[in-house]
Structure formats: structure tokens, C-alpha cells
Swiss-Prot record:
Species: Mannheimia succiniciproducens (strain KCTC 0769BP / MBEL55E)
GO biological process: trans-translation
Superkingdom of the source species: Bacteria
Function: Required for rescue of stalled ribosomes mediated by trans-translation. Binds to transfer-messenger RNA (tmRNA), required for stable association of tmRNA with ribosomes. tmRNA and SmpB together mimic tRNA shape, replacing the anticodon stem-loop with SmpB. tmRNA is encoded by the ssrA gene; the 2 termini fold to resemble tRNA(Ala) and it encodes a 'tag peptide', a short internal open reading frame. During trans-translation Ala-aminoacylated tmRNA acts like a tRNA, entering the A-site of stalled ribosomes, displacing the stalled mRNA.
Keywords: Cytoplasm, RNA-binding
Name of the featured protein: SsrA-binding protein
Keyword Nucleus in record: no
Places the protein is found: Cytoplasm
InterPro entries per record: SmpB, SsrA-bd_prot, SsrA-bd_prot_CS
Signal peptide extent: none
Amino acid sequence: MTKKKVKPGSNTIALNKRARHDYFIEEELEAGLSLQGWEVKSMRAGKANISDSYIIFRDGEAYLFGATIQPLTVASTHVVCDPTRTRKLLLNQRELASLFGKANRDGYTIVALSLYWKNAWAKIKIGLAKGKQQHDKRNDIKDREWKMQKERIMKNANRG
């Protein structure tokens, strides 16, 4: 049998850049998503946004809340497309119990970090997060700028 051809391009569908800016991410976890057919097609077209999304617990299950998947214009007319519906996360019971216990601590929440393809399945990376204060955000910006400045200095010094 021949090997599968690797398709060029990125497997990432959507990133939540604000999550790493607004939160300290303490633990990351991969989860599957329960999706409808039109959502998969839209995600393949890159019409997903998880920038304001977070995870809620209801009846012992985890749900993705606030994610937006825009339907394609050529979508079926007999299916009602709700772009902002809550989507169930596919996690095993041990992972659910662990996340639920950790998220119930004071100041912790669970946010969506990235949405991507793994083989043919849509996966979401979620993170246990603690909110940053304003001074923490400023320190991160200062550190990032200093790092870029150091690299610039080293580059110019190496040129001679």
C-alpha cells in the first residue's frame, strides 16, 4: 500500500491569541468537538473564530461557549445554521472530573486556545487559566520588547 500524501498547509483553523495575553495558562488539554456537517465544511473553509470562547460545565459535561462558526453561503436551506451554538466537548470522565475540580478554584477558568485538524478530526486545545492583572500584562510586553531589542543588538554586532 502507498503512504498517504501529506497535504501542504497548516492544520490550524483558528487561534485565540488574546487568551495568552489575558491569562496565565497553567495546563493544556486536547478535546474533540461534537459538530454538525455544515460546521465541518465551514471550518474547512476557515470560517471559525474562538477569540471570545470559553468552556462551561453543565450536567457533568463540558461545552464550548462563545465560539463562532459562520455558515457557508452555499449551505443547505433545510438546515437551520446557528453560528454561536454551544458545542459539546468530547472528553473522558477522568479528564472531565479533573478539569471541573481545577476550574472551581477561585480565579480559574477554562479557555479555548486553538482549533485545529488532527488527521480528519477537528480538535480544540483548551487551557486551565488564571487571569492576569494589568501589571502582569505590562511586564510581559516589556519582556517581549527587550527580547526583540537584544536580538536586534546581537544581529548588528555579528555583522561587524
